[in-house]
Amino acid sequence: MVRATGTRMGLLLPIILALAIGSSAAGISSNDPCYFEGKPRKCLPSFVNAAYGNPVQASSVCGAQQPERYCELLRDGNAGECRSCEQQRYGPAALTDLNNPSNVTCWRSGAVNVPHDPDSAPPDNVTLTLSLGKKYELTYISLSFCPRSPRPDSLAIFKSSDFGQTWQPFQFYSSQCQKFYGRPDRAKISKFNEQEARCINSQHDTGGAAQRFAFNTLEGRPSANDLDSSLVLQDWVTATDIRVVFHRLELPPQLLKVKNANAFSDEMGGSREEDEDDDADLELDGEQDEYDYNLQDNDSADAGYDEYEEPKKHLELDDDHLHLDYASDGESVVKRQGKHKGSAYEKHYQSKLAATTPPQQPPKVTPPGKVTPPSTAAPSAAASAVTLPISQHYAVSDFAVGGRCKCNGHASECVATVSSGSGTALSDQDDGQDEDTPSAPSLANHFGRSTQMSAKLTMTCACKHNTAGPECERCKPFYFDRPWGRATDNDANECKMCQCNGHARRCRFNLELYKLSGRVSGGVCYNCQHDTTGRYCHYCREGYYRDATKPPNHRKVCKRCDCHPVGSTGKTCNHLSGQCPCKEGVTGLTCNRCARGYQQTRSHVAPCIKVPTNANMIQAESAGGGGGGGTGDYKDGGGSQVEEMKKYCGKCKASPKKLNLNKFCMEDYAILAKVIGHDRASQDISTEKFSIERQNEIYKYEINIQTIFKRNPMSGTTSSLLGRGNMMLLVPRKSIECQCPKIKLNKSYLILGRDSEAAPGYLAIGPSSVVLEWKDEWSLRMKRFQRRARKCS
């Protein structure tokens, strides 16, 4: 039993080793998710936060030029503890670092003036631009806001798929979508507008204060469940860069109430009745202490705010261009004609504060940058209003982008590559980045403090399935036998190698040939080497012919024709047989000798001339024992030879030249073939049924079979193996001399014969064969014979 087991293991060991070597040679790991049991299948990279560790460019940073004062905003709308901010502490690096709820890091923008009339004030245009460094297919975008800070009321999210060259709307948020962005709230998405950006009410159907905005890129899109088949949605979720534009802050009702109360003073010409109405409205708004934001999927549109001649009812957005102007120091700059409408209000507000507020000591600054307001005794209502700031800051703690590295289903991972150079991925889209803001996806520079880049970190798909490119978006060189396609659950669309038989290193794809092949093969080889040509480098070029003794991929499969310069009519030969085109009376593979019945001359025009043939010549040649074709060699006396020849030729010429159904049924095969070459047999061919003892008694003709009208259904016979292409036809010498049949080169013939008259692998002309020069009008008759052949008994 042990011996039997050992024997069995000894037999299995070579198989196991062969499988292991084959798997290793193919470069396919057993744990590769892109293959299953050696067959390709769809694979995807891991789902990641694509924003983590990537640089963010901010148009405004709190304390960028000098330390600024900001105050926390309490839930009741009053100002809380005030602090001093600097860029190093509140820079954009905090947006994509590790988000730790117990130690929240924040980016804060520069001061944004609280407008007198938020509905008519120009937008703030504070921007954040995130470069992902590569194309990703995004699932969500999330913005988490800092505690005790105002939330944005209106913002727009844009995406770029070409590294910041162009921008496309992705999502809008606003409490007044129609008025501010000119778009309806929660517009319905159909299959006809799946790439349309939507606007979501930032205060709609929320319960409690929202700490973030979350946008699901596919939610509500009809083709979301069949992403592989929707080119529109594939383009929709693809992005290399994300830009967030903050247009307006949402302020607590209490803060707006104080500003409105100070603004509509007697000096501004307001009436008591209007003030009472406004106060009543503000009191209604003030009943809400918490502010909620809708967490819905969002789409964006490009925002162009170059000039503001006067306040508009809503912002007009251009979906093709995003016009944003930034100063070189990173502060946002908005071009306007005339003064800001809020500037007059601010001067009035400050003068009113000075008139109603008792003198105070300057605030004391205590570490770490906190600003402590001086204590006052029993402040009045007006004095308490003074503690509220007239400016606020956008504050975001986390900028997350969930998605997968875009690899079109041909890679299971993305790998980081480092290339030398400097500059940013968004060099053409400078958003006024501050000098200390990171400018390339380098983790070391992202958190700190240097702008000099000696290397650039990029992500690239580790492509499988014979694909290449950053997103595996094309077939790798020499794998163009089928078109590139995105991998799906049903088909991995693996790229196939071109079939060039080892004679070419380059190929291209031809769609028409691919369709004609039944969508099997479309590769076309070019620059074929080793004297080959053709789509697959499977033919020999002009002046060469294929050596049948060598495989198609052999470097020397094509041999030079070497046609005789005098005996041949050209330098080219048949690419299969190597037969050169010979002049009249010349024979041989290279046309290097005179045929039987011809004699050599000194003329280059007619190197061989025909010798008159008569009975005496035949008798003399027979008596002399001359061999090798021509009129032949006969053992009987001269008279008997002549009589035998006449008898044979008479029978041949007397045979019927008409074809009928009975004759069609009697033969094993019926073909239409064209004679493309000829040569005398160079060796004996002998079988049990077919024997030729002397090589000068047979002629070989190379024919090209064009149509097969009938073949013997019995397997193993020559006719059962017939197919369109080239084949050898054997013709007896006597038939050639009697011109029965009269065979000419480059002519087509209808040939009917029997398998018993030929050696296996050949066709032969025998006593029962029929050879007729083809006429086009016979096509209908042959089709009729084919239909009626079933009745052959």
Curated annotation (Swiss-Prot):
Originating organism: Drosophila melanogaster
Entry keyword set: Cytoplasm, Disulfide bond, Extracellular matrix, Glycoprotein, Laminin EGF-like domain, Repeat, Secreted, Signal
Record domain NTR: where: 649-792
Cellular component, GO annotation: axonal growth cone; basement membrane; extracellular matrix; extracellular region; neuronal cell body; perinuclear region of cytoplasm
Signal peptide from the UniProt entry: 1-22
GO BP annotations, alphabetical order: animal organ morphogenesis; axon guidance; compound eye development; dendrite development; dendrite guidance; glial cell migration; motor neuron axon guidance; regulation of photoreceptor cell axon guidance
Domain Laminin EGF-like: 405-497, 498-560, 561-610
Listed Low complexity bias regions: 367-378
Laminin N-terminal domain residues: 39-303
InterPro entries the record matches: Laminin/Netrin_ECM, Laminin_N, LE_dom, LMN_ATRN_NET-like_EGF, Netrin_domain, Netrin_module_non-TIMP, TIMP-like_OB-fold
Taxonomic lineage from the root: Eukaryota, Metazoa, Ecdysozoa, Arthropoda, Hexapoda
Region (Disordered): 332-378, 420-446
TM annotation in the entry: none
SMART domains for the chain: C345C (SM00643), EGF_Lam (SM00180), LamNT (SM00136)
Cellular location(s): Secreted, Extracellular space, Extracellular matrix; Cytoplasm, Perinuclear region
Protein name listed in UniProt: Netrin-B
Biased composition (Acidic residues): 428-437
Gene that encodes the chain: NetB
Glycosylation sites: N103, N125, N298, N746
